[in-house]
Amino acid sequence: MANKLFLVSATLAFFFLLTNASIYRTVVEFDEDDATDSAGPFRIPKCRKEFQQAQHLRACQQWLHKQAMQSGGGPSWTLDGEFDFEDDMENPQGPQQRPPLLQQCCNELHQEEPLCVCPTLKGASKAVKQQIQQQGQQQGKQQMVSRIYQTATHLPKVCNIPQVSVCPFQKTMPGPSY
């Protein structure tokens, strides 16, 4: 009887430890940061390859940089901090009336697999953010970074990318880390 009790308690302890370890592992997987993760925004290896083959979405990077650098005359900000794309990016006349750089960006995004659109846009956004950091512009940097990610978030919708309407980038903007 003592052997059975010992065996049952040892089995329960083993399952408890196994469950506890797998819960911890799951939390670690979801809490990884792009800065410390060698894969960066590319959790899917296929997307990293597509990003490199698309020359890092050059036109999209240029568009994001242009939008970030525009102060007053660029995309409109509503009072609640949301981006108003209707005036500046979406044209009722269709894609032929888009600014040429935006049209090139949309063409690049249409060449991506739907699964890779957001990871590649995140990679392009990070590249633009690094360009702004290297330029050393301190004034309005947080607002520029916010514009980069706001623009990138809505580009799939603006470009009518099938199966993707927005890219849910996290709004994490601690002071010195950008």
UniProtKB/Swiss-Prot annotation:
Organism, per UniProt?
A: Brassica napus (Rape)
Signal sequence: where? Answer: 1-21
Q: In which tissues is it expressed?
A: Cotyledons and the axis.
Subunit arrangement? The mature protein consists of a small and a large chain linked by disulfide bonds.
Disulfide bridge positions per record: none
Question: Which one of the record's GO molecular function terms can you name?
Answer: nutrient reservoir activity
Q: What lineage does the source organism belong to?
A: Eukaryota, Viridiplantae, Streptophyta, Embryophyta, Tracheophyta
Propeptide residues are: 22-38, 75-94, 176-178
Q: Which family does it belong to?
A: Belongs to the 2S seed storage albumins family.
What superkingdom does the record give?
Answer: Eukaryota
The keyword Signal is annotated on this UniProt entry: yes
Q: Which UniProt keywords apply?
A: Disulfide bond, Seed storage protein, Signal, Storage protein
Its name, as the record gives it, is: Napin-2
What does this gene product do? Answer: The small, basic, water-soluble napins are one of the two major kinds of storage proteins synthesized in the seed during its maturation.
Is the keyword Secreted assigned to this protein? Answer: no
